[in-house]
């Protein structure tokens, strides 16, 4: 549609020992996926609301010419802005008079996430080592606003759902005020950050008589 947009970038370099891909994705059509190593994009499943995404990343596989050391790196940075808005109008039939309801909610979630994974392996002679490193950082903010009200007469003549609720909560003098039987509003603001890191290293040394010494070191932080 007129207000929907999408832009993608995928770049690939490779030689006998290195394969590097760079990618970017910017859109407001709820697409949050990253491509595969061949540049194939898989669709996301986010049917509700509207999410604007900006994403950049890289994938690297490399080795030395003797294949003694191999290294694999994945890194991404993602900014998302998700907006979910709901409006409803209903009428309940009752013996004492019909009850008219109007409600509206707006939820906005803004997130930033950066991640890095590195897997390195070394194999030469009697020595071997594998190192796995993972880093994750996220920063999120959520704003939510919900309004609802009930009336003893049909408020449709005062306008749309939004216009009726605006008059219900913000107008000092209005014919609509005499029709209100109940109203409530909820506003919330949440913000949180997180960081986690993990490291797992395994190494061995093969002794001349065939036995093998092994060591494993791992740690996490969050």
PLM features: residue spans?
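Primarily recognizes Gram-negative and organellar outer-membrane beta-barrels
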Residues: 1-5, 17-222
């Amino acid at each position: 549609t007129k207000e929907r947009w999408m832009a993608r970038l995928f770049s690939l370099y490779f030689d006998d020992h290195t394969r590097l891909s760079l990618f970017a994705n910017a859109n407001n059509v709820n697409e949050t996926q990253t491509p595969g190593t061949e540049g194939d994009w898989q669709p996301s499943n986010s049917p509700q609301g509207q999410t604007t995404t900006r994403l950049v990343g890289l994938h690297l596989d490399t080795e030395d010419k003797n294949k003694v050391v191999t290294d694999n790196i994945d890194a991404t940075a993602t900014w998302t802005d998700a907006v979910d808005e709901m409006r409803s109008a209903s009428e309940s039939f009752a013996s004492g008079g019909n009850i008219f309801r109007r409600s509206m909610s707006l939820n906005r979630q803004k997130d930033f996430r950066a991640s890095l994974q590195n897997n390195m392996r070394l194999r030469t002679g009697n020595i071997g080592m594998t190192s796995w490193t993972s880093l994750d950082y996220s920063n999120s903010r959520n704003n939510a606003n919900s309004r609802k009200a009930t009336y003893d007469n049909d408020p449709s003549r005062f306008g749309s759902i939004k216009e009726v609720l605006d008059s219900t909560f913000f107008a000092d003098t209005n014919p609509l005020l005499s029709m209100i039987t109940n109203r409530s509003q909820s506003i919330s603001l949440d913000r949180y950050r997180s960081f986690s890191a993990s490291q797992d290293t395994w190494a061995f040394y093969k002794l001349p008589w065939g036995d093998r010494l092994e060591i494993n070191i791992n740690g996490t932080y969050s």
